[in-house]
From Swiss-Prot:
HAMAP family associated with the record: Ribosomal_uS11
Alphabetized PANTHER family for the sequence: 40S RIBOSOMAL PROTEIN S14/30S RIBOSOMAL PROTEIN S11 (PTHR11759)
SUPFAM superfamilies on file: Translational machinery components (SSF53137)
Keywords: Ribonucleoprotein, Ribosomal protein, RNA-binding, rRNA-binding
Keyword check for Transcription regulation: no
Gene Ontology biological process terms from the UniProt entry: translation
InterPro entries: Ribosomal_uS11, Ribosomal_uS11_bac-type, Ribosomal_uS11_CS, Ribosomal_uS11_sf
Species assigned in the record: Nitratidesulfovibrio vulgaris (strain DSM 19637 / Miyazaki F)
Protein name: Small ribosomal subunit protein uS11
Length: 129
């Protein structure tokens, strides 16, 4: 018996003038997510998804490309003003912020929300290269 064909609903363009940019910069990758003020994802991009593999994902240029891609998609949804939350110690933090600024967004605020332990978990052992 043949299964009924499923119709795929096309994503509708939401009109979101104000949003939040979450930049998560780890040592291995950078993830840029544009959300509305309630936290619902509008667009996202990462250095790995942008075509960079291996150690090139952790470069500032890869973070810049990822931020530009996510910003372009967010602008298609009508986003103009953003607040920026930055998390993590990675090298792509500044480059991603600069790319968001250069994309033509009005930046309302920039906050660093990197979690800092009050002597929590034991860190991984030091690398000997």
């Amino acid at each position: 018996m043949a299964r009924p064909k499923r119709t795929v609903k096309k994503k509708e363009k939401k009109n979101v003038p104000v949003g939040i940019v979450h930049i998560q910069a780890t040592f291995n990758n950078t993830i840029v997510t544009f959300t509305d003020t309630r936290g619902n994802t509008i667009s996202w991009a990462s250095a790995g998804q942008s075509g960079f593999k291996g150690s090139r994902k952790s470069t500032p240029f890869a973070a810049q490309v990822a931020a530009e891609q996510a910003a372009k998609r967010a602008q298609d949804h009508g986003m103009r003003t953003v607040g920026i939350y930055v998390k993590g110690p990675g090298s792509g933090r500044e480059a991603a912020m600069r790319a968001v600024n250069a994309a033509g967004f009005k930046v309302a605020f920039i906050r660093d929300i990197t979690p800092i332990p009050h002597n929590g978990c034991r860190p991984p052992k030091r690398r000997r290269v």
